[in-house]
Amino acid sequence: MTTMAETQTWQTVLGEEKQEPYFQEILDFVKKERKAGKIIYPPQKDIFNALKLTPYEAVKVVILGQDPYHGPNQAHGLAFSVRPGVPAPPSLQNIFKELHADLGVSIPSHGFLEKWAKQGVLLLNAALTVEAGKPQSHANIEWHRFTDKVIESLNDHPEGIVFLLWGSYAQKKSQLITNLRHRILKAPHPSPLSAARGFLGCRHFSKANQLLHEMGRGEIDWALDEKVS
């Protein structure tokens, strides 16, 4: 017997939203910016990587970011993750520190989080593009309208999801998560500016697995392999 989650996909829950004029306007804006010679991250093919790598029916955990990394070769469509061979930025270093303190897993030499995404961890930024060297430069082109819709669609997910909301921006999204089957864990942002105020020591990785276990869902293997393709 198939469950409702198995019959739902990102296409079925977001298909109508993608037909809205504002969504096409976002894509047109990004296309024009590239055509004008501006460098936009991530590359076009990677913009929707979070949704491609973590199918709707497979989502177990959601980690929300604000916007993509704005340095060369970093962003590839997964919040907090960087491409293989690129050093982990400071926030990700703190995520790894907490992961090590929480679960004892070794800190990897890379910051490529695709393994998490493929296990059901949706690594979603509120804005899906950014201009090189200009953080939050695309924060006002209505990406948030689309990504809020993503969160709302997950609120309707028939199985329990654990939302990890780090920092005040992500925590504002908790108002979109009203279904009591889901669980929300909050902590300060892992940025060096705030990590010591409670992100370090939050133990969200073990807590998320405990909640998934209680909900009858498979736990996440948070340890990252040393070799990545």
From Swiss-Prot:
Q: Which organism is it from?
A: Coxiella burnetii (strain CbuG_Q212)
* Enzyme Commission designation: 3.2.2.27
Q: What is this protein called?
A: Uracil-DNA glycosylase
A Pfam family assignment: UDG
What PANTHER family does the database record attribute to this sequence? URACIL-DNA GLYCOSYLASE (PTHR11264:SF0)
Q: Where in the cell is it found?
A: Cytoplasm
Which molecular function terms from Gene Ontology are attached?
Answer: uracil DNA N-glycosylase activity
Do you know which SMART domains this protein is assigned to? UDG, UreE_C
Q: Which keywords does UniProt give here? A: Cytoplasm, DNA damage, DNA repair, Hydrolase
Q: Which GO terms describe its cellular component?
A: cytoplasm
Q: Does the keyword DNA damage apply?
A: yes
Q: Which GO terms describe its biological process?
A: base-excision repair, AP site formation via deaminated base removal
Q: Briefly state the protein's biological role.
A: Excises uracil residues from the DNA which can arise as a result of misincorporation of dUMP residues by DNA polymerase or due to deamination of cytosine.
Q: Which InterPro entries does this one have?
A: UDG_fam1, Ura-DNA_Glyclase_AS, Uracil-DNA_glycosylase-like, Uracil-DNA_glycosylase-like_sf
Q: What catalytic activity is recorded?
A: Hydrolyzes single-stranded DNA or mismatched double-stranded DNA and polynucleotides, releasing free uracil
- Give the domain of life: Bacteria
Keyword Cytoplasm applies: yes
Q: What is its main location?
A: cytoplasm
Catalytic residues, per the record, are: D67
Q: Which family does it belong to?
A: Belongs to the uracil-DNA glycosylase (UDG) superfamily. UNG family.
